[in-house]
Amino acid sequence: MTDFEKIHSFESLYNAYRKARQGKRWKGAAAKFEVNLLEALNLLSAQIRTKRYTMSPYNTFEVYEPKRRVVMSNSYKDKVVQHSLCDNVLEPILTRSFIRDNYASQVGKGTHYGLDRLQEFMRRFYRKNGIDGWILKGDISKYFYSIRHDVLKTLIREKITDPDVLWLIDLIIDSTEGNVGIPIGNQTSQLFALLYLDGLDHFVKEKLGIKYYGRYMDDFFLIHHDKAYLQECRKQIEAFVQARGLSLNAKTNIFPLKHGVDFLGFHTYLTESGAVIRKVRRRSKNNMKRKLKKLAALHAAGRIDAKTVEQSYQSWRGHAEKGNSYHLIQRTDQYYNRLMKSKEAAQCQKH
């Protein structure tokens, strides 16, 4: 079976449909798709096989946490196709060259894995060099919106040669206006974005010789004992990303290890004794309190149930538990309980 056949086979599309329907916000769309499921999947398979498949218009909306972003969400049928493409071709082929410390959107990795690796690197550095070290914290400005279609297609063609698969990939890449930018909401965009800076990962590790390096999508760090060398690394990284149409965010800077670094929602720093401390960032705390207030108000108005509020809070709580956050969690638990009790009391008074 060719890679293209793996994508459009009925079995692959059925498995992709089952994965796509797991997201809560897709329940309504999944129900419509299921009305004539066999017919819908057979039609989709035939459309891809004969290259008559076209993508539906995007649903565009804005999200504001952790920062303002424009999200372009695709239709349910397009989501099914992208699941099949990613699971059967893109993920197994593109990730082969990824370094261990490329943390995002991969099975067995993620934010907590990235945080653990940063902590491990700091400990290793301390054992060899003590506390006198530096960390270059980098960030790509408007990453997804700046990815050039022509560069991305070239990088993909270094890995994938099947012309039929490339037809489908190009269709997805070119589904937005212009020749720059990929939709944040697409599943394929996650793998495309990981691939786009795979070359940077190898450049930093192999050419610049940085032992302690990690990247989570557009966020990366380098640890070294020599500040001057990290300044040189920054110049070379800047030149590398500029060649791909990208630029470093103004926040990119070099900090003493003992002052720590903001990475993946935590502030992580090294103490004089060699202990690595991980604290929830102030912005994350404030965002959670604001979100809880909004959710509690929606609950009091009868628009959502208490379970929805609790699930959101428990998700943040699980994240906070990955750091040195015992007292913070105790305080936030008390805040959450006060908030929910006051809203429940208000509801009782209404009735």
Where are the regions a protein language model picked out?
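Conserved two-metal-ion catalytic palm core of "right-hand" nucleic acid polymerases
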Residues: M1-L152, I160
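Conserved polymerase palm-domain catalytic core
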Residues: A40, Q47, D116-M217, F221-E238, ...
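Short, conserved aromatic-histidine micro-motifs
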Residues: R52-S56, I210-M217, N287-G302
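Right-hand nucleic-acid polymerase module
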Residues: N74-S75, K79, H83, S175, ...
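PAPS/PAP-binding and catalytic site of the sulfotransferase fold
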Residues: L85, I237, V241
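Surface-exposed helix-capping loop/turn segments at secondary-structure junctions
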Residues: T95-R96, E206-Y212, G245-L248
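Beta-rich nucleic-acid/ligand-interaction surfaces
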Residues: A104-Y113, F221-H224, F255-G260
